[in-house]
Amino acid sequence: MAAFERICSGIPDMDQALDNIRLGDNVVWRVSNLQEFRYFCEPYIEQAIKDNRRIVYFRFASHEPLVKECPQVERIEIPLSHRFEDFTVKIHKIIEKEGFDVFYVFDCLSELQTAWATDLMMGNFFRVTCPFLFTLDTVAFFPIIRGKHSFHAVKKILNTTQLLLDVYSDRRNTYVRPAKVWNRDSETMFRPHIYNRETGAFRPILDGVQSSRFYQVLDKFQRTGEEQFTDSWNRFFNTAKMLYDNHMNTDDACNTMCNIMMTRDEKLRFMVKKHFTPQDYFNVRNHMIGTGMIGGKACGMLLSRAIVRNLAPDIDEVLEPHDSFFIGSDVYYTYIVDNGFWDIRVRQREEEEYFSLAEEFAQKLKNGVFSEEMQNQFLHILEYYGQDPFIVRSSSILEDGFGNAFAGKYESVFCANRGTLEERLLEFENAIKTVYASSMSLSALDYRKRRGLDKRDEQMALLVQRVSGSYYGSYYMPCAAGVGYSYSPYKFLEQIDPKAGMLRLVMGLGTAAVDRTEGSYPRLVSLDMPQATSCTTIAEKHQFSQRKVEAVDTSGHCVRQMYLDQIEGFLPEYLANILLDHDFDAERSFRERGINRSVRFIACSGIVKNQILMKQIQDIMQLLQKEYEYPVDIEFTVNLSETGEYSINLLQCRPLKVFKDIGKAQIPEDIAEEKIILENVHSSMGLSRNVKIDHIVLVDPIAYYNMPYVRKPNVAKLIGTITWKYKGKNKHMLLMVPGRIGTSSPELGVPTTFADISEFEAICEIEEKKAGYNPELSYGSHIFQDLVEAEILYTAVFANEKTLRFAPEKLAEYPDIVSLFTEDPELKQVVHVYDTSKVSCELCNDLQNERLVLYQQ
C-alpha cells in the first residue's frame, strides 16, 4: 500500500468534497457534543469493517463508548493517569506494536483535562501522537469539545493534524466546516457543508438562505475574545477565586488545587490541605509560570512556612517573606515536545538505553529553544526581580518527598541578573536548561534506578528564588546560611543530645554548607549547646574553620568562591564582629615579632551566642518534625542589621531519613590480633551489621599523592567502572580511600560522584599525615545524605586513639584483580582490587557501642 492512498470514510459525498481521507491522516472533529462525532465515526467504522481494515478503539475517558462493541473492533482500555508520560508511552507502544495501515478511534481528547488539568498537556499528547501515527500510514479519528480549549491549544492541534473539521448542529441540519485539510484543495472544500444523515448527502452551502442559517448556528457557539484565550487551568482557578471572593464554600476547589498543583505525595497532600488557606493556593498560582505541579522542593518550602505561620505566629514575624516563582512541571514536557526531543525521551526510558542515551539527551536539553510565549513569561520574572540576583533550583515531582530526598542530584544555578534585558534573559534560559539537563545526570539516573523510580514520571518543575542577602561592594550574599536537622544521631561531642537538632552554619551562600570544600569547614552547632565545639584551642578553631566564602559577584556575573581576606574589607564592622573571631594566639605571635596585625577567622560566634535566634531555629525544626511525624532537614539564611534585628529565610524543608538500628552486631571477642585488618571506635556512621566482604578496593594514599594532579580524576573513574561492573550482582564491597571521598578537590581525596560508589557496602576514609590527607565525614553534606539513604556504612582510619589497629599490608595476601578493570600501569600502582570472596573476610559494625572490626576468619 502506498502512503497517502485514498480511503473511504463511509460517506461518499464527503470523500468527494474533501478529496478523500488518506492513509496517514489524523482527523480531528471539533464538536459541540459527542453525538455529533458519532454521526461521522459510525460510518467510518462500518466502512472499515467492509474493507477488512484492522480497527483499534482507544478507550480511556469516562463518557459513554464512542464505538459499539463488535468482534471486528479491538477495544484497548488505557487507564487515564495523571502521569502524562506513562499514559502517552503506553499508547505509543500499542501503536508501534499494531504497525502499519491500522484504523483508530480515540476517546474524546477533552477528557484528558480531568487528569492533567490543562490544555497544554492535551496539546502535547496530540503533538507527539499524531506524527507517530502519520509515519505508520494509519487513519485516526479524534473528537474534541468546542469551547473547552483555549485558542492556543487548538492552534497547536491545527498545526499538527492533517484534518480539522468543525461540526455544528441545529434541529434540522448538521454542518461541517473544514478548518484544515492538508495537501488538498478545491474551490468549495473550505466552505461550510450540510450533511444529511439520512441520505448521506454532503453538499457545500452556496445559497444565501442556507448560509444565513449556518451563521445563526455558528453565532451560538461564539466566545468572547478573553474566553478564547483562557484554557481549562485558568478557567478553573478563576471560578475558584470567584467562589472565594463571594464567601462560598471552596473545599472541593482547594482539594483540586492541591492535587493538580502542589504534590502527589499523599502524606504531603494531607498536610498541605490542613495548613493552606484558599489564598495560599491563589498566591502560588499568581507566581506560577506555565501549568502543572510546582514540585517537591517548592511544595516543602511553602508547606513549612504555612506550618510556622499557623502554629508559631511569633516566629513567623521574623521569617523573611518569600518572593519565589514556580515554573510548572508541564513546561518541562512542553520544552521537550517543542524541540522534537520526545522520541529520544521515550527511548531513554527503556532499560537498554536508560544510561547510554542520557548524555545525548542532556546535551539536547541544554541546546533547545523556548517558545516566544514562554520567553515572554520569563521576562515577567526578570521585571519583578529587577537586577537582584536569583537562583533557579530543581523542584522535580519526586524530589524532597518521603524517602526520596534527591540531595544534590539535580543542579541549582545562580543568576547574577546583570546586564541588558536580552543578556539577563539568556542567562535565565541557560540556567533553566542546565537544571533540565541535570535530570539526565548519571547520579540522578542511578539514584532513581536504585530506588525503583526509573519507570516513574520525573517531571522537572523549577523553584526560582531571589537570593536572600545584602550587597557588600559588588558581592551579594546573606550574612549567614545553613542546613538544619531536627534530629542527628551523629554526635561530634559525646555530651550533646541528638534530639536537640544540629546546624551546619556558614558565612555567605549556603552552598558551602552542603558541599565538601577544600580545607573549609562549616560551623557545627548542636542546638542544646549552640556554642559547644570539638576544638579545644583557638588554633584548632582557626584550623577547622570556614576558609572560603561564596557570594554572587554581580560585576563578574558569577558565583565566586573567595578566601576571607578577599571580602573581609567589604563587611561592616558590626557584621564582622558577629561572624568573625580573633585568633589571639596568632596576633600575639605577630606582636612578639613587632607586627601589629588583626587575625580573624569565620566562626559565626555572634549568631550561635544569640540564644533567642538559636531557640527559634530549633523550635522551627521541632515544630516541623512534629507535623511531619518524621525528622526533617531545612535550608535557611539569616540576615542581621546593625540594630540587632534579624530575619530568617526558610528556603527548603524535606523529610530526613536517619538510621534506625535494628540490633547489636555480634563481634567475636576472641579474634586473634594478627587476623585484624582494621579495628576502630567512635569513627563510624551506619547501621549495625555483620557482613562477609567479597572485594576490597584500596586506593594507596602515597601512590595517589605522588600521582600527577591532572590524572587523579582517573582514579575516581576507575572506581566508577568497578561499581558499574558489579551493579546488581549482590557483591559486598569495601572501598578504602585517602582523605575525603566525593570531594571536588583531588588534593583532599578522591573526587568521585555518589554514582561511582553506590554499590559499596562500606566506605573507609584513611588519614595519611605524610601526604596531608584527613578524613572528614561532613555531617549534613549531600554525600552524607546519600550514604544515609543508601545505608552505606562509613568509617575512618584516624592517626589517633580512635584507631586501635590498622594493618593494610594484610590485604596483599589476597589476589589483586585490578587488571580486570584497567590496563593503565599507573592506575594499577594506585588502585588495588583485592578478591576476598574465596576466603572469609568479615566486617562487623556495632552502632550501639561505636566499634568496628574488619578481620580475617
Descriptions of predicted regions:
Residues 2, 184-221:
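C-terminal regions of RecA-like/P-loop NTPase motor modules
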Residues 282-347, 352-372:
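A conserved helix-loop-beta module that forms one wall/lid of the active-site cleft
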Residues 51-114:
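Conserved inter-motif catalytic segment of the P-loop NTP-binding fold
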Residues 24-32, 54-56, 101-103, 139-141, ...:
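Residue-level preference for the first positions of well-ordered beta-strands
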Residues 115-116, 121-148:
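Substrate-engagement module of ASCE P-loop NTPases
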Residues 147, 268-271, 275-314, 369-768, ...:
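Conserved mixed alpha/beta core segments that line enzyme active sites in large multi-domain catalysts
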Residues 145-197:
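Phosphate-binding/switch region of NTP-binding enzymes
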Residues 6-61:
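Glycine-rich P-loop/Walker A and Walker A-like loops and their local beta1-loop-alpha1 context
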